[in-house]
Regions:
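Terminal-region recognition feature
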Residues: 1-169
Length: 169
């Protein structure tokens, strides 16, 4: 009988703003065999929802079995990656900020383009909120309430909601 190889999950640091880690995380995910395992170590205040969506899309497209460990903070757009993982770990000291999307632009644009963007932004915000709830796979009303309130949530609260496991330090 052939010996089975035990695969060690590829470990990926997710530290800083989304724009700081998006490229490295995507490259790291491409190193993981399709249907392989990876572990994310997260300390991120969030950032670009598009960058977070790119990472989550690749994670799901390649059907990776992912775990996430919140080392410190996991907020805003970084929550999308956390929610997309099959196993999630927090400490009692973990902080997670749920909030609605924020629009920020320094571009000079015509009023018609601004109106089109405003409609797109409203649709995207609802779709992203729905996706995040679906990715968490539980406590939908709690996640929606935290998001609406712009709430900082502790590791203990995430565990109590059934969305993660506690890792004591």
């Amino acid at each position: 009988m052939p010996k089975s190889k035990t695969r060690t999950p590829v470990e990926i640091a997710v530290v800083g703003e989304v724009d700081d880690w998006e490229e490295d995380v995507i490259k790291g995910l491409l190193e993981v065999p399709a249907r392989g395992e990876c572990a994310f170590y997260i300390d991120s205040a969030g950032g670009s929802v598009y960058g977070a969506l790119a990472v989550v899309t690749l994670l799901r497209y390649r059907r990776l079995d992912a775990a996430a460990v919140v080392l410190g903070e996991c907020s805003s757009a970084a929550l999308m990656l956390f929610a997309a993982c099959r196993r999630r770990f927090v400490t009692p000291y973990s902080t997670l900020l749920f909030h609605r999307m924020k629009w920020e632009s320094e571009k000079r644009i015509a009023s018609t383009e601004a109106l089109n963007w405003a409609k797109h932004f409203g649709d995207l915000e609802k779709d992203v909120d729905d996706l995040q709830v679906r990715l968490f796979g539980g406590a939908a009303e709690q996640v929606r309430e935290w998001t609406l309130l712009g709430r900082y949530v502790t590791g203990r609260e995430i565990v109590a909601a059934g969305l993660a496991e506690m890792f004591e330090i």
